Every structure is written in C-alpha cells, then in structure tokens.
C-alpha cells in the first residue's frame, strides 16, 4: 500500500564527538548491483516522502538508498536545538556515505539534500557520477531576494508553539495530503521535544554573511565551476525565473549545460509528493542518456 514507506528499514551508527555513536535510519531497496540513486529528504519531512518514488525507481531497475538526517524521521534526535550545526550534518552524512561505500551514485538532491549534497559533491566528487537537483541551491551567504522571504518564514515558523511537520508539507503541495499522510509525516515526533532537528534547520542554513559554514560553502561553489559530470535540474515550474529557480546552477556548473532541464507544472515545493511518476521517468531518461 502507498502508505507503507518500506519493508526494510535499516540503521547504522555515525560517530559524534559529543554524543558518541548516533543511529541513522535509512532505506535500501532494489538489487545490490543495480545503478544506485541516493535520495535525500528536506525540511519538514523524512524518507516517508519517497514512498511513491522508490517503488517506481526500483521497478525501473535502480537501487535506491534514502537516509533520514540525524534529528529527523527514525534517526536519533539530539536533546537541544543548539546541538545541531550545518557542519555536523555534513560530517554525519559523509560518515553515512563512507560506511555505505557510496561511489559513483546518482545524487537525487532535494532541498536540504542539495544544501548538504552540493557541498559534499564539490569536496569529495567520487561519491557521485551525476546529480539530479530539485528545488535546491548551494547557500553561500551572499544576498538574494529569496532570503528575505525565507527569514520571514523562519520567524513565523519558529514562533509557533507546535512546530508543524505534516502540515508544513501539506502547504507546499498542489494535491492536498490525506489526514493519514499528514499523520505519517508527524509520526516520528511524538511531542515537541523530538523536533529539535527540524526547528534547527532554518537557523543554520548559510544565508547570512556571518554563518560559520559560509567559507566552506563558498569554496565548494568555486569547485562546482569545474564540475563536468552531468547535472539535471527538475524544479517546480513556479520557481523558474525566480531567485529560487535553477538558472544560477545551470549557468555555473559545466555539467548542467545541454541537459534536459525541466520546470514541472502543477507542483509545489514538495515536488516529490506532486510528481513522483514524472520524476521517475525523467530521472530514468537522464541516467540512460548519461
């Protein structure tokens, strides 16, 4: 049934200097020898968002691995919001990739998947043979018209006594979620004490000049100017031509030139909810062509 995320959730431990080993939940589906696609979640969600896409990709002949970030989904939660930083998320995700022996995968980088994954791809390109970018950027702390909107959204979200998860996703889709789907997004967070990870994400995003992640992200952006591996952007059509669109990525990254980029109609920010079939088709075609 569509509501079932997966029959085979798995956990590995990533090291942390302060808290010791932390359990990181992930899904691993498809034949072990099949071409690998790494699927990354975003703000407000966990790997449940891939419940429709994973079966389509595995049916098309791919292996899919989808991790929950520390603080999200079925992964361990830290006690305080301040326990998370952008760099720690980078380190945890790199540890996951190393332990899973990820090499030459297709990075399917959605929202925070791109914020973290583009940095990692620039620093250690051996993880990825190609990239699919969805409603994402590499934030470097430089001014952008979209940042003011984000700051206002962040202030509004953090002021809420109950930090929304399922409802956050529901406001970012064109096809409304069912009550059961909203409840599934909320399920890993029995009360507000479990939401330190989601609450911290908007605060640590490197959109300000004084963010400690800015120097490393700027260096990564410079490295991406030399990235020749194939890069495909699949964004919500409403983002095309705006500060949240893919144009800067396409212009900056050599591997993005000449690819079949698309703006998907009738999709919201949580594009994976709205367009799983089209995303599976376009991703399959991209892998076949590259």
Where are these regions (language model features)?
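Typically the conserved alpha-helix immediately C-terminal to a functionally engaged Cys/Sec
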Residues: 52-56
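Conserved alpha/beta-hydrolase
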Residues: 57-78
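Conserved SAM-binding loop
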Residues: 39, 66-67, 109, 133, ...
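Short beta-strand element of the alpha/beta-hydrolase
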Residues: 34-41
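Membrane-embedded alpha-helices of multi-pass transport/permease systems
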Residues: 47-50, 62
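Flexible "cap/lid" subdomain of the alpha/beta-hydrolase fold that forms the substrate-access gate
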Residues: 1-16, 24, 29, 43, ...
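Catalytic histidine-centered segment of alpha/beta-hydrolase-like enzymes
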Residues: 267-280
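Short acidic/polar mixed-charge low-complexity motifs
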Residues: 18-22, 34
